[in-house]
């Protein structure tokens, strides 16, 4: 499985469709997804998947160079429902894992349970179905054999209760071409929707080199959780760069974190969720020091995406270049 920071042939995003999670702000979420697609399209090709009834609205909101296609979906978190791509013997393969709505929390999910294979068929990609529950946001790889994930998510009984930790690690390595799994204990404290996805706390930017989300407020549960994760990563031999500030927002009486770490690395740029926090400029500059060869772009869509339960990384999926 190539790293996210390797070259892409394109990015795939979905048009928000689940009004239950956004309520009266669904249109705002749709605008945010379009803004992200339009930004990424300045660096690489982008496809926007939309329900047939939303096709016109999506096309009107997206730039002309964004390809909008009609495929039925329940929700818009394509990082989790979409395929994880591997390259084997020079051939691109879409690995299509079992999707169960994040432990059957969000129903219905029958359309999202098949979107990986339907998208791959539309794109003409070879597929491999895998009988194990997995979301793409629960892992990250460095492209050199190391995969990072969280115990909180992958060992949760609502995912694969009959599989042991070792069995899960073995399956990840065999299907995604990895040599080892680094198990972080935690996701973020308020990440109840996904049970602690890794893409809120860790992102590889090089071989055995990872950026990790920290927290500078000792009164937050994430202060100790992030510190423990960082310690575990260092003990695993990883070079760790820390983003020390973790913003929180309250939207419609719901409190959520907006981690800078939930960024997306596309060709020649890093797109970062921001929410008007005092530290936004400083943290974007820090990311520029960690990743000096790419443009660092902050998009102020972090708050609305957090209302839906995720961030920029959660709604994107890269297709590796061959």
List where the protein language model places each region:
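The feature marks the mature, well-folded catalytic cores of soluble enzymes
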Residues: 1-322
């Amino acid at each position: 499985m190539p790293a996210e920071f390797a070259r892409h042939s394109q990015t795939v995003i979905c048009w928000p469709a689940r009004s239950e999670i956004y309520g009266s702000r669904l249109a705002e979420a749709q605008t945010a997804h379009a803004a992200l697609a339009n930004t990424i399209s300045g660096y690489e090709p982008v496809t926007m998947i939309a329900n047939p009834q939303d096709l016109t609205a999506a096309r009107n909101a997206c730039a002309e160079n964004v390809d909008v296609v009609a495929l039925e979906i329940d929700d818009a978190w394509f990082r989790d429902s979409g395929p994880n791509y591997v390259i084997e013997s020079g051939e691109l393969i879409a690995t299509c894992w079992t999707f169960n709505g994040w432990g059957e929390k969000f129903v219905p999910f029958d359309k999202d349970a098949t979107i990986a294979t339907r998208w791959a068929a539309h794109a003409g990609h070879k597929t491999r179905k895998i009988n194990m529950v997995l979301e793409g946001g629960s892992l990250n790889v460095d492209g050199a054999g190391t995969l990072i994930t969280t115990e909180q998510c992958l060992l949760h009984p609502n995912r694969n209760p009959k599989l042991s930790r070792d069995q899960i690690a073995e399956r990840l390595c065999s299907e995604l071409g990895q040599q080892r799994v680094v198990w972080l204990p935690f996701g973020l404290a308020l990440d109840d929707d996904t049970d602690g996805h890794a893409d809120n706390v860790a992102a590889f930017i090089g071989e055995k080199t990872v950026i990790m989300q920290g927290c500078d407020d000792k009164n937050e549960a994430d202060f100790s959780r992030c510190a423990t994760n960082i310690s575990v990563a260092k003990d695993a031999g990883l070079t760790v760069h820390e983003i020390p500030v973790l913003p929180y927002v309250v939207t419609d009486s719901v409190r959520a974190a907006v981690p800078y770490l939930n960024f997306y690395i596309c060709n020649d740029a890093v797109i970062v969720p921001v929410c008007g926090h005092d530290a936004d400029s400083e943290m974007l500059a820090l990311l520029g020091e960690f990743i000096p060869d790419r443009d660092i772009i902050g998009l102020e869509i972090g708050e609305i995406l957090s209302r839906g339960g995720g961030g920029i990384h959660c709604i994107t999926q890269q297709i590796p270049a061959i």
